[in-house]
Amino acid sequence: NADVNAYGSDDEEFLPGVFSTGQILEQNGYNNCLLIGSDKSFANRGKYFEEHGDFKVYDYNWAIKTHKIPSDYFEWWGYEDEKLFDFAKDTLTELASKGEPFNLTMLTTDTHFTDGYVCDLCENQYGQQYSNVLACNSRQVASFVEWIQQQDFYEDTVIILSGDHLCMDSSYFKDMPDGYDRRTYVNVINSDKKYTGDARTYTTMDMFPTTLSALGCGIEGDRLGLGTDLFSNTKTLAEEFGCSALDYQLKLNSKFYNKNILN
């Protein structure tokens, strides 16, 4: 297996065959921006976003260059989420002032394993660091969403909260009841689309068409790539084949992927 964190390095294009959400938004006049409190070079994330949607990438080094943090400042992955949310408010205000469609994508990190990052806002509610961090970050996210809802641009803005993967701190979840189904968190706020059907079995791949659908895009056949629009009644691949079978298929070598995506 290739070292995925080293993919796209040097002069190599990052997944040249991919056509992403960012590119679709760019073609429709959106200003794309990525805000992260770490170095954009990790796993070449910055390169991916710059090549797929012409994102302006505001990372840890950007924060130093713009004097938002001291040159010797380094906490956790770079700087903590408390600062990230403050910088996001400034960035959103600037993007909205242009009078053009915009997309701000953010990555929070305080809740990453192991045990999370204890910031100045954390309270000792539970006597356990990770629980305190999770509660603190939840409050910060809620406060940030409430701030957006008070802004003039909120009327035409969709907010999507999405976890990138399950928490990898397995020891923290060792006392979970048998049969408890852990999932990544997904919430779509202020979309004109509403889903009133049964609970869904879905994967991160389904967020591609679901995000665009939440923005009002029409999706022929309800699918893009390997993802299914969760606002539709079309089964996801996980629902159609089961998670285990889908997992197995995804791990197989794909000539199409190698030729058309990796190129």
Where are these regions (language model features)?
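Solvent-exposed soluble domains appended to multi-pass membrane proteins
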Residues: 1-263
